[in-house]
Amino acid sequence: MAGTEYYLYRVKFIKPAQMPLLFPNLSPSQIFLEAINEKPELMLSSGSEWHLGNVDFFDQLTGSFAIGRTTKTTLEKFDKESGNFIDKLDDSSPYTTVVFDCRIGLLGIAKKSKLAPDAETVARRIRGLFEKSETVINTGAEVKVNFIPDPQGFIQKIRGAYAIKSFKATFTGPNPVDADELFQKPLSVYAQQIGARTGALEVKGEALNEEVVESVAKSTAATANTASARIIPEEGKKVIPIKMKGDAVSVVVNLDASYRDVLERIQEEYSRVRG
């Protein structure tokens, strides 16, 4: 049976250390929710206009919405009255569906080549739309929409290594509620307090703890950050660098599946990555 491919992304609303005095102190989940409900619009210099609509909630914090663009296009039509073929200027509005979970900032973007060549293009437009939201503007939040990489290849190399000599991971300001307590969560607070957008921390040693490195690597992937390491793959071998890389994690869902079912599959796949 044919299916639709959904790509996993993480949206972050990173609040500044000093919030505007006249605006309520909203959580990232609340900012996410308000931004969706505003149904913002985005005009590009190319003349195309992007929209967010068709918002449907499954509960208070999960649901789906449509994102698409409107452009002027020339349609070739047959005019029965004149008996001639004519060119008629009309609007074209391709769109795709996105399922979401505001609790953890999780997105599942449906692939649709008629709208964009890849999910990354759609993700950039989602970020642009959220940046136009009055709630985002008033809170001064920075919006990030990044794909969730599959960490399994990286983790397999970590598990099989003779020794882990160094480990490096990036972090951003606080947002993900499920960030690990050891690395991502405290460093994200540090980034916010010092006024940094992003940061990276590298640790080195003769043989780093494999279980801790694996745990932080999973959290790093789930929060849409990046990681790298230097390992000795086998005894007597030279140190080599490895990186967590690849495309967004994706799932294929049957065409007749409801959007609730789609979100459930997205959440299950996210849990696999998070570990």
Short names for language-model regions:
Residues V99-A110:
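Glycine-rich, often proline-containing surface loops adjacent to acidic residues and nearby aromatics
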Residues S92-V98:
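Short, charged beta->alpha transition segments
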Residues Y95, L106, S166:
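Broad gene-expression machinery/nucleic-acid interaction feature
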Residues M1-K77, N84-I86, K114-G275:
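Terminal interaction module
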Residues S82-S92:
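Short, solvent-exposed beta-alpha or beta-beta edge segments that form flexible loop/patches at the rim
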